[in-house]
Amino acid sequence: MVNEYDTYNKWLKFFSVRMVQSIIQSRLGDEIESKCVPYSENAVDWFNMRIDELGEISAYLKSNIKSYPPVGTLTLEFLLYTPSGQLLPLEAWILSSSEGTDDCSRNELYHDMSTLLRSAIVSARMTPMHRLYVKKQHLETFVIMYRVFENDISSDMGKGKKTRKIGELVSKFGNISLDLHYRTSMHFEEPEIAPVTPVEDVEEEIDDGEKTVVDENIQTRTVSECVPIADAKKRKASGSVESATSAGSSTSREAAPRFILGQSTSSEDSRHSDVQNSYEEDHKPSLADLRNHSFPFVNLLQSAYNPANGTKKNSSSTCLNSPKSTPEDKEPTIEKVAESFRAAKIDEVVFEEDEDEELPLDSMELSEDSFVHFNQLSDFGGAPSLGNELGDYLKQLKTAPDMTESGDIDICNMDLKTELEKISSQTANFNNFLKHVNSFSDE
């Protein structure tokens, strides 16, 4: 007798697990092929049906359900979840067991359980939820979630709810009953969800001032959290088995995108861009930036070019038609060079007063005493510094031999061979000039 009761409990536990697996898999929207066999050749094929169990559902049941019928009542509930956070209960499958009768003579309980399991699989595909919502699930519209708990207190199905008894099996150990409650009015109403947490010791005040304490024995067990059907579908496609969390719940692994009003993803990524660096890349340095501290005698170039427009001043232009120097000319001394630089300040004042009056090139004849003129003061601060090096350099420039005769050179009518011969004839003079220049460095 004890062995028969243990067998009854074993059959009922495996029936509960197969029923939950079959009904949840019917909500995936995929076609499932279930083949019936005349007898069970494999111990896994319970109730003459081969059902592929999903590891996620098995782990969920293992962590949440501690006792199966006939000890307790098992409830499988499906809810519709919207992106706005609203939950709408759609179905509730309740498997319960009651006391049996001793005069029951039926001994085909195992085959009756197989028939009841097939009836549940067929009924799961005939409900309004399956016809209207199962194949239309989407993350942006709605998803179907499920939860399993150990009591018969399901959520309110709203007005017009219907109840159907899928089947009832009678045995001497107990009567097994499977009931279906489903919604017909698809509108959100309050309250929709049954209490998720058990009620603690609540004190209610009566009009006469007395207090009554609610008995803990009549309180319901903790209701497990909801699990999206889409997660079970993903695990089935990938074939992976994941253990449930300590709370027995599983949330969606796919995070919804975050949208910020008035801000795009590209603007958020580029908000740290450096505007100043982009400006500096496009900025081209001016002439003053390039020439400062780039080569010696920068003040001479400063006097020849105007940094504002980069044009060459007439007063500092060197004419190629200047008269050829004679040996009788005296070399300028350092004192004369200093006087010419000091005179540049006076010339600058006169030049600013008569800035609009430009002098022709022919009227500007160079002399030994005034071979360098500054039209404006240096932008680098103060008057140009004078020294022996600058005076020696100017002497070398004056003593350099002329390579061409005075006069205009007509490049178009020039005979290249003749010009090369002239240059070759001046090679000796140029070599002597180089020796003369090198002698200063040797000293």
UniProtKB/Swiss-Prot annotation:
InterPro entries: ATG13 (IPR040182), HORMA_dom_sf (IPR036570). This is Autophagy-related protein 13 homolog. Residues 240-253, 308-325 have a biased composition (Polar residues). Residues 232-283, 308-333 are annotated as: Disordered. It is found in: Cytoplasm, Cytosol; Cytoplasm; Preautophagosomal structure; Perikaryon. Its main location: cytoplasm. GO terms for biological process: autophagosome assembly; autophagy; macroautophagy; mitophagy; piecemeal microautophagy of the nucleus; protein localization to phagophore assembly site. Keywords: Autophagy, Cell projection, Cytoplasm. It comes from the Eukaryota. One of its GO terms (molecular function) is protein kinase regulator activity. Residues 268-283 have a biased composition (Basic and acidic residues). Belongs to the ATG13 family. Metazoan subfamily. Gene3D superfamilies: HORMA domain (3.30.900.10). One of its GO terms (cellular component) is Atg1/ULK1 kinase complex. The keyword Cytoplasm applies. Component of the unc-51/atg-13 complex required for autophagosome formation. Required for the degradation of germ cell specific P-granule components such as sepa-1 by autophagy in somatic cells. This ensures exclusive localization of the P-granules in germ cells. May function downstream of the let-363 (Tor) signaling pathway to mediate sepa-1 degradation. Plays a role in survival during limited food availability. It comes from Caenorhabditis elegans.
